[in-house]
């Protein structure tokens, strides 16, 4: 089965694992997923991730989810820009998520970064997802 939107698949896996209170979740590896996971780790939404390579299988990322008082740190994660409807935002159109408690993850000409990093770099781009 082919996967039309790998990033949406990763987001769904993270959501489902957090709802089931799993400590780890795995997802197929890709460069875009690695960059999004880097942003999530830097912002403190996940503990980290590691690349797992098994002989004869595709490489996977094993993501360690983060919890606080038994509740997932990621309360909500949603895909914004989809293959059928791309969403782009300029620097002045980037609004804070949940009064600054959440982040947007953008794909910019300078790489994948959070909305605060994009404001600091004065660059806009495609809004991949929102996390809070």
Curated annotation (Swiss-Prot):
What GO terms are given for molecular function?
rRNA binding; structural constituent of ribosome
What the entry lists under PROSITE patterns is as follows: RIBOSOMAL_S8
GO CC field? ribonucleoprotein complex; ribosome
- Cite the entry's keywords alphabetically: Ribonucleoprotein, Ribosomal protein, RNA-binding, rRNA-binding
Domain of life (superkingdom): Bacteria
What Pfam families does this protein map onto?
Answer: Ribosomal_S8
One biological process term in Gene Ontology: translation
- The UniProt entry's coiled-coil ranges are none
Described function: One of the primary rRNA binding proteins, it binds directly to 16S rRNA central domain where it helps coordinate assembly of the platform of the 30S subunit.
Question: PANTHER family recorded for this chain?
Answer: 40S RIBOSOMAL PROTEIN S15A (PTHR11758)
Recorded family membership: Belongs to the universal ribosomal protein uS8 family.
**Mind telling me which NCBIfam families this protein's record contains?**
PRK00136.1
Oligomer status and interactors:
Part of the 30S ribosomal subunit. Contacts proteins S5 and S12.
Q: What is this protein called?
A: Small ribosomal subunit protein uS8
């Amino acid at each position: 089965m082919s996967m039309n939107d790998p990033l949406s698949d990763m987001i769904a896996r993270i959501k489902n694992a957090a709802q089931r209170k799993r400590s780890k979740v795995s997802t197929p590896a890709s460069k875009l997923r690695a960059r999004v996971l880097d942003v999530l780790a830097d912002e403190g939404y996940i503990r980290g991730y590691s690349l797992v390579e098994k002989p004869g299988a595709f490489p996977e990322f094993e993501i360690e989810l983060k919890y606080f008082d038994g509740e997932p740190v990621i309360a909500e994660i949603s895909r914004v820009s989809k293959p059928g409807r791309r969403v782009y935002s300029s620097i002045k159109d980037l609004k804070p998520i949940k009064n600054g408690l959440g982040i947007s993850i953008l794909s910019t000409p300078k790489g994948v970064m959070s909305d605060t990093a994009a404001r600091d770099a004065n660059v806009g781009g495609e809004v991949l997802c929102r996390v809070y």
